[in-house]
Amino acid sequence: MNNLKEAIKQAEHIVFLTGAGVSVPSGIPDYRSKNGLYAGMSSPEYMLSHTCLVREPEKFYQFVTENMYYPDAVPNTIHRKMAEIEADKNVTVITQNIDGLHEKAGSKKVVNFHGSLYHCYCQKCGRSVSASDYLQSDIHADCGGVVRPDVVLYEEAISESAIDQSLAAIREADLIVIVGTSFRVSPFCNLTDYRNKKARIFAVNKERISLPYPFEMIENDAVKVFAEI
């Protein structure tokens, strides 16, 4: 932990790569753990697929609104500390999470790699729709089109904008910190392939992750680690 604290002090350009484990302490379940969102479900990937959205929009809407939204969740120590570090450093947060908690914590440079539940739009007219309106109905009041959250579903591609912003930040970073993710989902896990080779890499996760190049592993609860930074 002391090594990470010192690395953050010395770094000028920091990238945090965050996953579901960052939001679990805020009461938002991860996906695949024994207590995760998918536990006991027979076809959760289908429910969050483009096919389901197109073929069974009512079923998609019910699943998303009943299982994905946690509007009362608040940022935890990890989110807050990352935002705090941004006050003194050039920090970019690239997150797999779609819950908006990094922004709630005050982080300004956030790349929502898989989109955000709190950005919604009508598929018919393209206009933005508030998340609060979407939670009331998935039918756009203005044109009758079907509204969806701007998140990356199964069978959909990551946006070019998210990839471009991520690669620009990764290439500039002299410190990369992977937090709360097994770092196995592509293309998110491939981002570090484009790093500056002089950049230091740390990983903070309860379970050890594997990378094909040198990095420093902190196998611990990220809340405890960030509380001491």
Swiss-Prot record:
Nicotinamide binds at I98, D99. The gene is cobB. The keyword Transferase applies. InterPro entries: DHS-like_NAD/FAD-binding_dom, NAD-dep_sirtuin_deacylases, Sirtuin, Sirtuin_cat_small_dom_sf, Sirtuin_class_U, Ssirtuin_cat_dom. It is found in: Cytoplasm. Belongs to the sirtuin family. Class U subfamily. NAD(+) binds at A20, R32, Q96, I98, D99, H114, T181, S182, N205, V223. It catalyses: N(6)-acetyl-L-lysyl-[protein] + NAD(+) + H2O = 2''-O-acetyl-ADP-D-ribose + nicotinamide + L-lysyl-[protein]. Residues 1-229 form the Deacetylase sirtuin-type domain. Keywords: Cytoplasm, NAD, Transferase. GO terms for molecular function: histone deacetylase activity, NAD-dependent; NAD+ binding. This is NAD-dependent protein deacetylase. The active site is at H114. Its main location: cytoplasm. The lineage of its organism: Bacteria, Bacillati, Bacillota, Bacilli, Bacillales. One of its GO terms (cellular component) is cytoplasm. Pfam families: SIR2. Its EC number is 2.3.1.286. NAD-dependent protein deacetylase which modulates the activities of several enzymes which are inactive in their acetylated form.
